């Protein structure tokens, strides 16, 4: 399946089944995270079978249920864009493996992530087998997202990918 198809299939999921992630899938996720860390210089860490991070008032407020696995993206405070870019590489790998995810900014408890001096926890991604596959949210039209004097196939494909990209509260503030 190509990356655009994965992007079309992927939707945020907040409720998860009580089902462990198989060791073969864990190995693929760990491998992707290691590659991404080497390229990005971020400190992305994955936690399996660790429900405490989402066992808090804020997690319940965010309507998260049965989250036992998560990915913590740690880096310098100015690494937000890198966190999004490289985090989405991992999210799409999870989607390819049949797993569901959700980007989580504030509605979680204390993470077990190791945070070194000068770093901060940038964002968390919940991970597991969803109760559902999530639902698509309304996206802005390509005309609302960008402008080009002449439309080309590569531009249209790129803008389609932009329209599918996750953004905070689905605001899609690209311009």
Task: Give the role of each language-model region.
Residues 1-175:
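Acidic, surface-exposed loops and disordered segments
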């Amino acid at each position: 399946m190509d990356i655009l198809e994965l992007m079309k299939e992927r939707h945020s999921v907040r409720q998860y089944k009580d089902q462990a992630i198989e060791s073969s899938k864990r190995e693929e996720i760990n491998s992707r995270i290691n590659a991404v860390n080497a390229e990005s210089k971020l400190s992305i860490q994955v936690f399996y079978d660790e429900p405490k991070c989402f066992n808090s008032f804020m997690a319940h407020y965010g309507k998260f249920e049965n989250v036992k696995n998560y990915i913590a993206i740690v880096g310098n405070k100015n690494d937000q864009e890198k966190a999004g870019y490289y985090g989405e590489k991992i999210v799409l790998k999870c989607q390819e493996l049949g797993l569901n995810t959700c980007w989580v900014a504030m509605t979680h408890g204390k993470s077990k992530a190791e945070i070194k001096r000068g770093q901060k926890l940038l964002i968390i991604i919940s991970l597991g087998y969803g109760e559902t596959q999530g639902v698509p949210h309304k996206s802005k039209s390509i005309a609302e997202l960008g402008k080009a004097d002449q439309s080309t196939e590569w531009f249209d494909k790129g803008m389609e990918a932009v329209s599918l990209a996750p953004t905070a509260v689905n605001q899609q503030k690209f311009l």
